[in-house]
A protein has these predicted regions:
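C-terminal, flexible cofactor-proximal segment of oxidoreductases
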Residues: 297-386
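A Rossmann-like FAD-binding core segment of flavoenzymes
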Residues: 70-77, 93, 167-262
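FAD-binding core/adjacent interface of flavoenzyme oxidoreductases
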Residues: 67-144, 149, 242
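Short glycine-enriched, charge-decorated loop/helix-capping segments at active-site entrances
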Residues: 44-51, 115-120, 284-291, 349-353
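Beta1-alpha1 glycine-rich phosphate/pyrophosphate-binding loop at the start
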Residues: 1-69, 157-190
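FAD-site-proximal beta/loop scaffold in flavoenzymes
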Residues: 116-142, 221-222, 235-307
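Rossmann-like NAD(P)H-binding beta-loop-alpha module
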Residues: 130-177
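Catalytic nucleophile loop
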Residues: 9-12, 152-155, 294, 302
């Protein structure tokens, strides 16, 4: 009996750690990840302004697992029906039960020039590249323009970091920062009160917001947009262009994010968890792609894989075991906006120091849950100083 977890983001790490406890002793467990570290992705934007945070948000994979075998390789393809995985080395892995936790890639929608000229934020290296370019622009001493495409949480956080970086470098008055969003508001997938508070925090930092505005093209020095309602086009100068405008499935899934429902089961042998899938929960609600959702979905997925493995090892007689449904209850939402933050818990929205403290506690709580107490302490210090 072999269980395989593909990907070591929030979903993969959480699921594999739970399987270490839940799988029958006779089962083998493998986790496959291209990198040898686990990244606390929701903090990576901080490295644009605070490179010192890197140590706190990168965790060696080998330190996270007691039972699972860690394979450092890129997943090239997955046959979710047969349970065969092809790695970049040409080697194949077969599983009896597998979990697709490959996360998502940045989507470019075939927009001319966007992939070529738009910086993305998926890694510490990406954050370092954005920081280097921002400092180059600042160091010219000339007026300059920064454009961020996409005003979901990632775009909001990038715009906030760049505005605060420019302020810390004494250049904010000559650096224009524009945040573009195709839908009607910033943070469009979130509650209205949260959206309003985020917009206020952005406005306080003189970040110009263009909603109902789609990016149609990018060059080395400009971004072309079109207003969704009027059809009017505009060209914005862009000395730095960052693209956070959407997600697509991993290359191993041919860019697809398959739909899974309450039991998170894609096929008889394969489950899909986290950003790798479009999840519809037990209440019929679409689950947002987020760290919180990925971590929470990993628990029922692990329970279901373990139950099926135990049933099969016992002979597989009779009906399959009843699987645990996933029901997503959002505990709240938090986003940093430069040196500020916005948090919503229930109906209440808070900003300022309380929100910053909550932001720090979320990251630290996650690191502590994976036994990285020292890194959790480091992260709290970095967040509260940000």
């Amino acid at each position: 009996m072999h269980a395989v977890v593909l990907g070591a983001g929030y979903a993969g790490v959480t699921l594999a750690r739970k399987l270490e406890d839940a799988l029958p002793p006779a089962a083998d467990l493998t986790i496959v990840e291209e990198s040898d570290t686990h990244l606390v992705q929701h903090e990576v934007h901080r490295a644009i302004r605070r490179p010192s945070i890197t140590d706190a948000i990168e965790v060696p994979l080998e330190s996270l697992f007691d039972r699972a075998a860690v394979v450092t390789a890129r997943v090239e393809s997955v046959d979710s029906e047969t349970g065969e995985v092809t790695l970049d080395s040409g080697e194949t892995l077969d599983y009896d039960y597998g979990a697709l936790c490959l996360g998502a890639e940045t989507a470019f929608y075939d927009l001319p020039g966007v992939q070529e000229h738009g910086h993305t934020l998926k890694s510490v290296a990406d954050a370092e590249t954005i920081r280097e370019r921002a400092l180059e622009v600042i160091d010219t001493g000339e007026p300059a323009s920064v454009v961020v495409g996409g005003a979901g949480l990632s775009g909001v956080q990038v715009a906030g970091e760049l505005a605060t970086l420019a302020d810390e470098e004494g250049a904010r008055e000559r650096i224009d920062i524009t945040l573009l969003e195709q839908r009607d508001s910033v943070a469009p997938a979130f509650p209205e009160a949260f959206q309003d508070a985020v917009a206020d925090e952005l406005a306080e930092r003189d970040i110009e917001i263009h909603t109902q505005t789609a990016v149609t093209e990018a060059t080395a020095s400009a971004v072309t947009t079109q207003h969704e309602a009027t059809g009017d086009t505009d060209e914005l100068a862009a000395d730095l262009f960052v693209w956070t405008g959407g997600i697509a499935g991993a290359e191993a899934m041919a860019g697809d994010r398959p739909v899974v429902r309450r039991d998170l089961r894609l096929t008889e042998s394969t489950f899909a968890v986290g950003d790798a899938a479009r999840i519809v929960d037990a209440d019929g609600e679409a689950v947002p792609a987020s760290a919180s959702a990925a971590i929470r979905a990993a628990t029922p997925a692990a329970e279901n894989i373990a139950a099926l493995a135990e049933w099969e090892l016992a002979g597989g007689d009779g009906f399959e075991p009843e699987l645990t449904p996933f029901r997503f209850n959002a505990p709240g939402w938090i986003v940093s906006v430069g040196d500020g933050a916005v948090a919503q818990v229930g109906p209440e929205v808070v900003t300022g120091k309380p929100a910053k403290a909550m932001k720090a506690s979320v990251g630290a709580g996650y690191l502590s849950s994976i036994r990285e107490v020292r890194k959790a302490t480091e992260l709290v210090g970095e967040e509260l100083e940000a």
